[in-house]
Amino acid sequence: MSKRDYYEVLGVSKSASKDEIKKAYRKLSKKYHPDINKEAGSDEKFKEVKEAYETLSDDQKRAHYDQFGHTDPNQGFGGGGFGGGDFGGFGFDDIFSSIFGGGTRRRDPNAPRQGADLQYTMTLSFEDAAFGKETTIEIPREETCETCKGSGAKPGTNPETCSHCGGSGQLNVEQNTPFGKVVNRRVCHHCEGTGKIIKNKCADCGGKGKIKKRKKINVTIPAGVDDGQQLRLSGQGEPGINGGPAGDLFVVFHVRAHEFFERDGDDIYCEMPLTFAQAALGDEVEVPTLHGKVKLKIPAGTQTGTKFRLRGKGVQNVRGYGQGDQHIVVRVVTPTNLTDKQKDIIREFAEVSGNLPDEQEMSFFDKVKRAFKGD
């Protein structure tokens, strides 16, 4: 099955800006996140959205994708020039290695190698993402078997050198090619490329040299993290191989939506409902912020859609570059379930105001003020 176009996946145009791509990703990642969406196939859609964002948010990867799409230009003979494509089950590195005695360097199966990286998804409340916190997580990961010290062999015994590959972890296979008979190196299937055979396996780890355990890790979540961002914990991944360094743990943050606030970068947005009288006559109201309640003066004549800004009341930048603002959008609430007296007042106001704008000799809200004040 062919891959979908990354722009189509995110629902943006090919000329979309980085901000547009980021907004689309955040919206779709929340929609399809496995912790929220339990529908079948949501996890695959989440992975598809993540893959598209990782490519289109990177300038170099995006330029490469715009030019070549999902096709790797380094494969085959066409377009991008001569590459290391498939040629009858062997590579050109193997051919030239056989003919000229050079080619790629053989990897030592017993050389130290870094352990695999791990990923952990952490769900945060809106407030915890804004202010940060200290927490402890528990992850399953492989630890070096203490019984055999990672060798995989029963205590008192040692792994033996593979007799098939001589400890190299590779076998030389002869093949007939248009260039003649050449030697192609393959991973030794007898020792699975390790160069060692374990005849007496450790009873605790079954010869693997590793045991699955759950480990508790303290995590310091920085203030200002956003949905989709990740924190790298060096050395907290899988243990290294043959004495190599451990891999890293990547903690990916998923931030739950807030019932009142919305976030865009370091800025916070919210909608403030006002009564008809408050909007017409003006008022001083208390506005909730992440940092506590703040008094906001509403001028007379304020209409739906009017915006106010509270500087420094947003989220701290995760890299320490200042503080965001809180933006307030006014929504004037039309009264419902009016009493007879309230209906009479509004009818009286309508008679004073007139029904057409050109009949009004003063501003609409001046008349509202007069009607409510009884002038």
Curated annotation (Swiss-Prot):
Its main location: cytoplasm. Residues 5-69 form the J domain. Its cofactor is Zn(2+). Participates actively in the response to hyperosmotic and heat shock by preventing the aggregation of stress-denatured proteins and by disaggregating proteins, also in an autonomous, DnaK-independent fashion. Unfolded proteins bind initially to DnaJ; upon interaction with the DnaJ-bound protein, DnaK hydrolyzes its bound ATP, resulting in the formation of a stable complex. GrpE releases ADP from DnaK; ATP binding to DnaK triggers the release of the substrate protein, thus completing the reaction cycle. Homodimer. Belongs to the DnaJ family. This is Chaperone protein DnaJ. It comes from Bacillus subtilis (strain 168). The gene is dnaJ.
